[in-house]
């Protein structure tokens, strides 16, 4: 039967190996089975293939602590949490909060520990940032100022359109490789509910306007305002405003934070549709599935409910 070795026994193994003793002789000397010695050496060898007793002992302690941590969480609960990670790509915080609403207790720290201890790296692939957070300096885009006729500044937007009431939207366009493909994205600010569709004619303002009208027409009564940036693709904003009976406001130049809801949503989309990808390589069904997955994610701001649930609660 396998026994946990002490530091003294590990030191004795080291001395035995140096003395060219057989595994059987070492096992007899420290009163353990030969299989225990064999497993110990295979499990704790260093990069050169040798056995370092001190490193072996530290690694064993770390493994033991990890097992103890995971042992506190019943296996079915851990499996349920990891299923949400792998199938839904939710963050540990989202998983923990969602399960808590179901009466199931598991901390996000426990989930993070399991991810870090997964030597295959498979679990890490389902974490949005791969547990690495890099801060890049923002570069100002070298674009010519665009004059959008009759644009209304965000500073004229009513105070109540602060993201807390239902019906205030943000609009954007994400571009594919070489700016030859695009996807229109719309986000309802209070619920983070996302609507996204491929734009067949990239940066064509009239086609974009008609597409946005089609996307939001089913929710026309729930479109109080739309906020967007100063891209030339939004030049036909008056056509959108007229057909949806709404008001459209434009952010200041280089002020992406003024439409933070759609900016953050676009980052979630990039988990599935990365930068540099030609959108013509993906299907409309894949785009719909991406929208579906993002709308199903529980959010902290929604008390770990999903945007889909809270959005359609307003219609019940």
Q: What would you call each of these model-derived segments?
A:
Residues 221-236, 254:
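Acidic/histidine-rich, metal-coordinating catalytic segments
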Residues 55-59, 106-161:
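Basic, flexible linker segments flanking DNA-binding modules
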Residues 175-179, 196-220:
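Active-site beta-loop-alpha junctions of metal-dependent nucleic acid enzymes
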Residues 1-89, 93, 97-98:
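Short, basic alpha-helical/linker "hinge" immediately adjacent to a nucleic-acid-recognition surface
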Residues 166-176:
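Two-metal-ion RNase H-like nuclease active-site motif
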Residues 181-183:
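Short loop/turn microsegments at loop-to-beta-strand junctions
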Residues 13, 37, 81, 95, ...:
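Mobile genetic element proteins and their domesticated derivatives, centered on retroelements
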Residues 19, 29-31, 78, 87-88, ...:
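Charged alpha-helix within mobile-element recombinases
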